[in-house]
Structure formats: C-alpha cells, structure tokens
Amino acid sequence: MFLFNILVLHGPNLNLLGLREPGIYGSVTLDNINRLLKQEAEAIGVKISISQSNHEGVLVDLIHSSSEQHQGILINAGAYTHTSVAIRDAISGINIPTVEVHLSNIYSREEFRHHSFIAPVAIGQISGFGSQSYLLGLKAIVNYLKNRGD
C-alpha cells in the first residue's frame, strides 16, 4: 500500500526537453525525468501520476480533479508560472499541498521570469537544480505530508 499519491504536472514545452535550449535546460529528456521520478517514488513508497500538457485548461482540469485521488501536487508549469492566474487559482481552490519546481533558476534568467503566480499558493519552490529539482520537490512534498500533523 502506498503512503501517498502525488500528481506530477509538466507544463508547456517540457515535452521538448533534451532538444530545447540545452544550454539552459540540459540534455535530459522528459522521459528521463519521469523515469527518475518513478524510481524515487518507488524507493520512498509513494505513488505518482504524471501528466504533461501544453494547454492551460488541461492543466487546470487536472488540478481540479486531483482532490479526489491525490494528497499532493508537484508542478513545473513552465511559462505558465509567469502568466497563469488560472493555474494559480486552481491550486488555491483545491487545498492540496503543492510544490513548484523548475529546472533552471528562474531568478537568474530574464526579468519576466522572476515572478511566479504559483509560488504564493505553493508550500515551496525549488529551482535551478536541473532534473534534481523534481526529485528534491518529490521528497519535499512527501516530507511535508508525513509531518504536517506535527
């Protein structure tokens, strides 16, 4: 039996990892990241459900439906981090702990990337560690869920 079920959401253009701007995002593919996440989830005894979409409404719908089966959300909303009030409001409206992750350090990049609509409604944000950002985020959300009653 799994301790928790975590929803992992990848936003727009993350399906192009390994091809898109490797100087910023590295050579790792989304399949590589998903494989690492599945291995880590198994090692720590949690179940993960993984989805990627380039469409804001699809991500909002996935967040809305997560309250029925997930205890936490790990999200890299990609460019929607900086533009989507809809994703921010969806997270705010479901009362499920959420960790925001980014491969690159969004604060060392272009000025328009410095603002996150998601960070204020997330329990935390991890950025700048490449694919490790996802693994750190998964560990963080699970640790939070285990200890939130303390």
From Swiss-Prot:
Record keywords: Amino-acid biosynthesis, Aromatic amino acid biosynthesis, Lyase
Annotated metabolic or biological route of this protein: Metabolic intermediate biosynthesis; chorismate biosynthesis; chorismate from D-erythrose 4-phosphate and phosphoenolpyruvate: step 3/7
One record GO biological process: amino acid biosynthetic process
GO terms for MF: 3-dehydroquinate dehydratase activity
Residues at the site labelled Transition state stabilizer: R20
Residues that coordinate or bind substrate: N76, H82, D89, L103, S104, R113
Pfam families found in the cross-reference section: DHquinase_II (PF01220)
Active site: Y25, H102
Reaction it catalyzes: 3-dehydroquinate = 3-dehydroshikimate + H2O
PANTHER family assigned: CATABOLIC 3-DEHYDROQUINASE
Subunit structure: Homododecamer.
Protein known as: 3-dehydroquinate dehydratase
Protein species of origin: Trichodesmium erythraeum (strain IMS101)
